[in-house]
């Protein structure tokens, strides 16, 4: 009769080793995921060494370590514990050989998690333990299960190291691989075949189950999402465009909740920070109040870095951040409030919704867990109602469109009533029609929001419509800060003019108190404002150039003949490239860019050249050096 002892011994050893490996592997992977020291490569190699070393070499090293004269074996012997040639020696070898698989698989799962998800959880008030428990582990779960399965299969099949450390003692340390080996050695191929089939069934069965479980779960979620999409999405999107009483009443439902958390004094944010980056040094100082502040600048100017420093995701090298009288960061005093304690909400570019949580759970994530469940449910319902998504409460983020995800992210950020709301290019992933809708809804939400708002955007129109104040950055430094009207209508420097969309700029020379020469345009211009001694250039915006087809007296100020060099068409207008004084020699030979609507272009295009261009003195922008 077949002795089943090797099967039970193998299952017991592999199970215990897998349990130990599971927790040790997760802890090791979590440590290595955050460790960035110089010894990272060495530590990683040590953890992976059992996977590449020959089993006999590994067994010999363990024998030296745990033998009677070994450093650990000596301690065990003095304590009356003998490790070698016992069943728990087999557990040790199985754990050592299985650990690399669990560690590497788990580390890969951790590295695939979008770091913005963890940062979003921290900004919503979650501690590191909460982030690990509610975000990291659930998102890494498929990898953890795969790693545990591989570890179990490896522990079940361990032979060489186990033979050297635990020996082959029937009924005590003889595992399935050893039973197979000695059965073949004794000529009992029937027993060897049976045990081989058992190992194949157990090991491959577990791997197949894991491989089938993961895609099946994803397909199920997608199918259920698509079932309701046909009925709910179109109805919900249509409801957003209606202007009935329900739409007007929904924001009112939040007023009572918002009034309870309204600050006693007007919110204030004071920021002075310096951070050294690879290409430049971010050095800014500004303040903000309840009126939204827009951050404008080219790519890499430091706009998003400012938000990350405010939220606590990045640490400035020097500076001070004070919010409503509370110091969040002070390099001199050594103060750096953790992310979870800053009460700052941030809307990431990719929205950073937690994919394993429903929409309602996402919105409720930042609410204090000590609140009564009824109050949490009420707040979640109010927030989703305000963004017209209450019907989607039990759905998951991947079942929503980009615009719906953006609104959920905004509702989640506002649910806990943060003192500061940071918006990092919130409309960048939306199409034009949806962008306009979401922008209007954002403006409506901000009217009831009683905190400080900072908006990062590359879109000038967005910044102008949403924000009252603007902060213009170039190369990490502030080049303009003030009301949006002043910055757009009276930019002081060339960089500010260019960043606010001025396309016509020319070096200038002063000819008198109200007269300058535009050197590139080869003309003398009259100005309304007195010319400053610091004047270096002059500009005019493309849409403010006045074009006429009838000739005017050449003595009229700022009036010149012009010829059309080439055109560029947009959906609703035309950009005209104009050469002053004489016809152009080629398409690139032009002085000015003028933008006109297509109805204006229809009346211009058939008129004979030259046309007349008028540069209104009120529209001229007098610029100083940066």
What is each of the regions a protein language model found here?
Residues 265, 271-317, 321-322, 326-327, ...:
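Non-catalytic connector elements of ABC transporters
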Residues 415-419:
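A short, proline-enriched helix->beta-strand linker immediately N-terminal to the Walker B motif
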Residues 1-5, 165-204, 208:
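Interhelical loop and adjacent transmembrane-helix boundary motif
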Residues 396-400, 404:
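Conserved ABC ATPase signature
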Residues 478-482, 490:
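ABC ATPase "signature
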Residues 127-129, 326-331, 374-392, 444:
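Conserved ABC ATPase "signature" region
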Residues 328-345, 369, 487, 491:
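ABC ATPase NBD coupling module
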